[in-house]
């Protein structure tokens, strides 16, 4: 028998049914959580063995924010807006403000900075709300210009898309109900653990906790609903995401253990648009220089994750 469903579960589920958009444009929505959890199977993916996953394309010369005729950035400017794939239900990173209706967060601030660099106006963007599993697809199909959705830079993803330099280093942890007998990664055997489908969190769970029973959902909010309904025993994901979930549910807690992975976030760009990657890296360098990265971290993440260790140093040298 399922444990009692807390009232918050119904609130969260109801919010998920609302259509979401941004900047006056609404072309998609956040899927509702699954009616039944999807149990995943298959062999755990092998640990990644490449040593250059953080290496990106260096910004261009003396004017990294130049927009040459015929460039990807020029095409975006002619269109009149930047199109970005984002989350709209990941509190602190990309979520709808219930008062203003705007989708906002740490990841959204990067979209604004890219739009500002192209148009001189940080509001010239359209947000396409996507699930974690759709991040590669929308880039491969050129449905968006960038994806800013807490996406870990991995060797496998480099095979189908391109990444900016690392803009944040997260780490994977575990969230449980208060009073749970789960104390860490080594106590997950026999427990149902939720992670969004198509994420490195799910891959890491399969590899590092083979005795756990993995359960997939469209997003972490869907996992939270399953936890509240008693259909899963724990959620695993990046510390940034879990901090956002715990801040919304007084019965949830992130286990006080060291992160068991490193999850470097990058801005995703279509693989054939190297000029756009260089441009985005120029934007990131500008955020380092003018303090806007630190300001964004202080606003969104510092209250929950503590003082920043600083914007990650970029690694360049990748060639097309």
Question: Where in this protein do the model-derived segments appear?
Answer:
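C-terminal motif of bacterial Sec signal peptides marking the signal peptidase cleavage site
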Residues: 18-22
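Extended ligand-binding regions for polar small-molecule ligands
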Residues: 39-67, 199, 267-305
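Short loop->beta-strand "edge-of-pocket" segments that line small-molecule binding or catalytic clefts
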Residues: 83-86, 104, 185-199
């Amino acid at each position: 028998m399922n444990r009692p469903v807390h009232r918050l579960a119904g609130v969260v589920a109801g919010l998920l049914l609302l259509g979401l958009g941004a900047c006056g444009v609404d072309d998609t929505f956040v899927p509702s959580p699954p009616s039944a959890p999807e149990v995943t199977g298959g062999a755990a993916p092998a640990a990644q063995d490449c040593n250059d996953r953080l290496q990106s394309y260096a910004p261009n010369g003396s004017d990294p924010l130049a927009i040459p005729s015929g460039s990807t950035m020029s095409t975006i400017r002619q269109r009149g807006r930047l199109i970005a794939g984002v989350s709209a239900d990941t509190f602190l990173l990309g979520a709808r403000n219930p008062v203003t209706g705007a989708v906002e967060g740490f990841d959204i601030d990067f979209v604004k900075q890219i739009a500002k660099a192209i148009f001189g106006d940080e509001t010239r963007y359209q947000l396409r709300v996507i699930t974690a599993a759709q991040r590669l697809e929308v880039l491969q199909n050129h449905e968006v210009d960038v994806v800013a959705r807490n996406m870990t830079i991995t060797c496998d993803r480099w095979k189908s898309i391109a990444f900016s330099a690392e803009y944040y280093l997260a780490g994977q942890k575990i969230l449980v109900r208060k009073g749970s007998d789960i104390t860490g990664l080594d106590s997950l055997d026999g427990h149902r653990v939720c992670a969004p489908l198509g994420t490195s969190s799910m891959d890491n769970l399969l590899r590092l906790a083979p005795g756990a029973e993995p359960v997939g959902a469209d997003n972490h909010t869907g996992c939270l609903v399953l936890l509240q309904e008693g259909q899963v025993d724990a959620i695993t994901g990046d510390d940034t995401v879990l901090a956002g979930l715990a801040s919304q549910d007084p019965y949830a807690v992130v286990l006080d253990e060291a992160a068991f992975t490193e999850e470097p976030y990058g801005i995703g760009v279509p693989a054939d648009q190297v000029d756009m990657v260089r441009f985005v890296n120029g934007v990131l360098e500008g955020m380092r220089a003018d303090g806007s990265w630190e300001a964004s971290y202080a606003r969104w993440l510092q209250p929950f994750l503590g003082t920043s260790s600083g914007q990650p140093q970029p690694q360049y040298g990748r060639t097309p």
